[in-house]
Amino acid sequence: MKAQESNKQLFHLRLNWTLGLVVVLFLVLASRLWQLQVIQGPEYVRLAEQNRVRTIQLVAPRGTISDRNNVPLVENRSAFNILLYRESIKDMEATKQYVVEKLGVKPEDLAVKMRRGKVAGLYRPVVVKEDVSIDDISVVEAHKRQHPEIQLGPEPRRHYRHGSLAAHVLGYVGEVSEDEILREAFPGTAPGDLVGKSGVERVYNQNLTGTDGKREVLVTSVGREVGFLDEMEAQVGGELQLTLDFDLQEAAEKLLAGKVGTIVAMDPTNGEILAMASAPSFDPNSFSTRISEQDWNQLINDPNRPLQNRSIQNSYPPGSTFKLFMAAAGLEEGMISESTHVYCSGSGVFYNHLFHCHKKEGHGTVGLEQSIIKSCNIFFYELGRRLGIDKIAGHALELGLGERTGIDLPGERNGVVPTPEWKQQTRGAKWFAGETISVSIGQGSISVTPLQLLRGVSAIATNGRLTKPHVLLRVEHPNDETPSDWKVLQLPVAADTFKRIKDGMWGSVNNSGTGHNAAIPGVDICGKTGTVQVIGNDRRKEMKKDLAIEDHSWFVGFGSRDNPEIAVVAFLEHGGMGGIAAAPLAREIFSIFYAKKQRRETAHPDVTQLSEARP
């Protein structure tokens, strides 16, 4: 009993001590709080009014872009923007007047920028003018005290070293739009951020975009920096190395000067794009700062559509280049053999309609090889009649026509390989047998992009390797990996089918065929020309002075016959005959490629072969 009473007294004693300690601590805290608020409060208010923390965004440079041989294509240059810190504004009307009158910003533009700035948040500065001149910098510096809310902010700007060269591949950057922010097209972006708008700048925007840093400084109420608090450095974006070869790209651009068309060169074995030029073009440097409304309207209203990449975003009838795919269909279906011959008199009647060959007097009796060499229409009209449109379409699709290639560039078109079902679905009309005859020589409803045609012919060159074209070679960044899904599909097509087609293509270039203007001494170039009729002969006479009625020009080929290393397609809108207009363009690309190869081999001879040589 006594023990219980003793424990009870001990408990109450400890409780009293604990309560006493709590009371003492409370009194100490209350005293300190009273001191801070009453005694020292005015001093802290004064300091808070005099000094504020300002967070300055350190914009991360985008990653650089180079060609396959490390030739720089896209870099960054130093630039300054004029920034408005809204939390530092004392007199809004005075600030607006200063920005408009002294810095030359239109009132309506400033209103838009201020409205968009509200979306970004109060403590994110509004960019009121980009990439400013020395004169603007001088004005800001001279008015620092009167307008501390206006500051200069460094920002790296995109610089495309060679102007319009490879513009459609590289693309350009621009300010993220409100719609793109709402759609989360570029996650994590805010108004004022620059993002890729086209080309690899867009496709690999995430790889190229770095991580912004920040600097925290102490500023006075008039905006003068009085102390440094902390800094987190910006992290530069990943570097891209492309598959392009600068020399081939430059040559393709020069060959297209003053023309409307495209030239694409590709490694047929793996789909690496060595050159992709489209004309007319544009200078992406004009987008590095906000492009003027006048310049933008001029670009989008240009009837030749310079922003369009004709390699992948336009589709055209393939003309006589489609005869290669017709040959593949005929051979695979067993409708062509060594003994298959057709007599060409210059014209022929099919389904009660008269169809003509391009050679009025005819080619006489021709087999498959000669029909490719001479590009005889009558042979392929007859082959089309035997095959029918469904078999023609099936083999064309198998070789990659009429569908996107999957290239790592935006805006690629499908093209069309027509069938009766397609016509019914898209036009609500019946397929006529005569349409099959037109399709058999690449006319009528069929259309392909130049890259699709190049990919299909590359499959012929490599005995059935259907590649996925791409422009990215590698990404250099610790956190990014180079895509490795450049799949190659091996087509189930007989080797003899490809051999016989290549025999005809070789003869077209090297045996007085329509592609002879692509021939290079010492190199077995294989190719096929195409000339696409834009308007009927009856109307042609009425409009003979109009350039828009001229035929489209094609040439597609590869080299060499037994060791395909490069495939080239050249296309000119309204260029005339393919053998005259397009074939010489391809020849120049082939010539540069093999000249470079010879220089490399001379500089770095094969040591193994040299060691095996005997006197």
PLM feature spans:
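Periplasmic/cell-envelope proteins involved in peptidoglycan metabolism and beta-lactam response
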Residues: 1-294, 303-306, 315, 337-343, ...
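Beta-lactam-recognizing serine transpeptidase/beta-lactamase-like catalytic domain environment
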Residues: 2-6, 12, 74, 219-229, ...
